[in-house]
Amino acid sequence: MGFGKSSPFLAFSILVLCQAGSLQATPLRSALETLPDPGALSEKEGRLLLAALVKAYVQRKTNELEQEEEQEETEDSSLDSSRAKRCSNLSTCVLSAYWKDLNNYHRYSGMGFGPETPGKKRDIANSLEKDLSSHFGVPTDAN
């Protein structure tokens, strides 16, 4: 199963080793052993083989990248479909949007709201009474 992916690399490495062996400054064989090998590749054949291997490698990589992009697109569309299923009931989506807005308003409004601020409600009520009494001309206590 892993051999199918590594076969272009194996052929490429064999080609490189053959080329490196022929380019050595001091040959390892004697002059008598340098008879032409019928299985050896000519320079043109080696270049064609190398070009074919590179082309196959590039094609395989582009196919892998396309498959990854398709998988990402299907994952994105599945997220959108799950959100659409959740928001199929319009009141649920509207309620959650209003809930977020309400929480943001109370969080950033500066008014105390909720169980975290038990004393501020009285302070706000007292300040409102003082403001209303000043508008209507009612005298306030000097406390």
Swiss-Prot record:
Signal peptide feature range: 1-25
GO BP, one annotated term: adenylate cyclase-activating G protein-coupled receptor signaling pathway
A GO term, aspect molecular function: hormone activity
Phylogenetic classification of the source organism: Eukaryota, Metazoa, Chordata, Craniata, Vertebrata
Species of origin: Ovis aries
Composition bias type Acidic residues, residue spans: 65-78
Keyword annotations: Amidation, Cleavage on pair of basic residues, Disulfide bond, Hormone, Phosphoprotein, Secreted, Signal
A single GO cellular-component term on record: extracellular space
Location of Phosphoserine modifications: S42
A Pfam match: Calc_CGRP_IAPP
Propeptide section residues: 26-84, 122-143
Cystine connections: C87-C93
Name under which the protein is recorded: Calcitonin
Similarity field: Belongs to the calcitonin family.
Biological role stated in the UniProt entry: Calcitonin is a peptide hormone that causes a rapid but short-lived drop in the level of calcium and phosphate in blood by promoting the incorporation of those ions in the bones. Calcitonin function is mediated by the calcitonin receptor/CALCR and the CALCR-RAMP2 (AMYR2) receptor complex.
Residues that bear Proline amide: P118
Region (Disordered): 62-86, 112-143
Domain of life of the native organism: Eukaryota
Residue spans of biased composition, Basic and acidic residues class: 118-133
